């Protein structure tokens, strides 16, 4: 875990960028599904969630540099403390598994 040393203004910009990227990536997933590219859709859905969770972590002054780190910190900070319902952790883990299956 790394505590982010950003100014409040910079942190807001990074969070905004990650959320915009999450939205664009989600739209890519929707387009992939419409065109029958299920594996690509799984990849894009995972990354949309990853960008959104990363934005959430950064907004709380946490930053991690790996996919597993994002998943673990999300669980540690938000799920174990019942800030976010655990069902969203399960969905995030399922998306990660689907991405791995589709990519490899």
Give residue spans per PLM region.
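Terminal alpha-helical segments
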Residues: 1-104
């Amino acid at each position: 875990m790394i505590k982010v040393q950003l100014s409040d203004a910079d942190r807001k910009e990074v969070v905004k960028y990650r959320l915009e990227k999450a939205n664009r990536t989600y739209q890519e997933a929707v387009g992939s599904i419409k065109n029958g590219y299920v594996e690509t859709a799984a990849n894009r859905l995972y990354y949309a969630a990853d960008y959104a969770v990363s934005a959430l972590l950064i907004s709380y002054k946490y930053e991690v540099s790996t996919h597993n780190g994002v998943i673990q910190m999300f669980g540690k900070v938000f799920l174990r403390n019942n800030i976010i319902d655990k069902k969203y952790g399960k969905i995030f883990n399922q998306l990660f598994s689907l991405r791995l299956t589709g990519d490899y």
